[in-house]
């Protein structure tokens, strides 16, 4: 099973490398299927209004993008092991766009070739309070969610004597999508004449996160308000804290 997956991933890498340079000029890399949420507005603008060809490389075999058959979007699945490491080291492209930080500081390195690396934030949080030191140092350009990112990155560059990056005030595409979706809903989904509100609990993950420290107590208190409560755990929590989520589901699932 593992060997068969590895063979498929190497074949995918070979298929990518066989493309003409113009067809792999712009590459998006996704750690998992959730990355599409942040990439889609950019991909649609590039392939639609600008008429560009892009490659979308994912580490998840369950990524919905693999079922997307569009002439201007070529998809590849390279897994998250040896093949991915080889892909990054040997990448030949003009631009690589990714939501994964820590480029060059852990196992994912910059290519030996000349590639322009662009980082896209997948959250609104601070760039230095929620990430490792050096998480963004090796990117060439960063799409900033807000002024705090721009200020923090410039301060970091000055403090450590780093080469200035291209900082683009891009906003948060995910929030734009949510607001656009809400505007498209029928009025009975958004009106709250009954007094019952829809409360979404969608915190981050990790040892200090809200659900890991106060999950059951929080949900119990919120349910006591009589409102409709939805708990949406972080994708990394789904991956690494399944037992905790299972307990929450068992305790509050019927609600």
Positions of predicted regions on the chain:
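Active-site and donor-binding regions of nucleotide-sugar-utilizing enzymes
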Residues: 27-180
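Conserved catalytic-core segment of nucleotide-activated headgroup transferases in glycan assembly
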Residues: 35-51, 55, 173-251
């Amino acid at each position: 099973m593992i060997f068969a997956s590895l063979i498929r991933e190497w074949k995918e890498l070979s298929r990518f490398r066989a493309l003409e340079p113009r067809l792999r000029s712009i590459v998006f890399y996704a750690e998992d299927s959730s990355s599409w949420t942040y990439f889609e507005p950019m991909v649609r603008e590039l392939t639609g209004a600008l008429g560009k060809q892009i490659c979308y490389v994912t580490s998840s075999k369950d990524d919905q993008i693999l079922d997307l058959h569009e002439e201007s979007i070529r998809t590849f699945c390279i897994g998250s092991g040896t093949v991915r490491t080889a892909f990054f080291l040997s990448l030949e492209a003009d631009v690589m766009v990714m939501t994964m930080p820590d480029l060059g500081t852990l196992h994912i390195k910059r290519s030996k070739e000349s590639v322009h690396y662009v980082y896209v934030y997948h959250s609104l949080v601070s760039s230095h309070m929620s990430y490792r030191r050096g998480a963004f140092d090796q990117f060439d350009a960063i799409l900033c969610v807000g002024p705090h990112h721009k200020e923090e990155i410039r301060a970091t560059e000055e403090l450590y004597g780093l080469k200035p990056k291209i900082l683009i005030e891009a906003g948060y595409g995910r929030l734009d999508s949510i607001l656009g979706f809400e505007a498209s809903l029928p009025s009975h989904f958004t009106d709250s004449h009954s007094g019952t509100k829809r409360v979404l609990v969608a915190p981050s993950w990790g040892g200090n996160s809200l659900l890991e420290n106060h999950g059951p107590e929080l949900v119990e208190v919120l349910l006591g308000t009589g409102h409709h409560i939805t708990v949406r755990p972080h994708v990394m929590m789904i991956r690494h804290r399944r037992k905790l989520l299972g307990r929450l589901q068992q305790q509050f699932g019927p609600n």
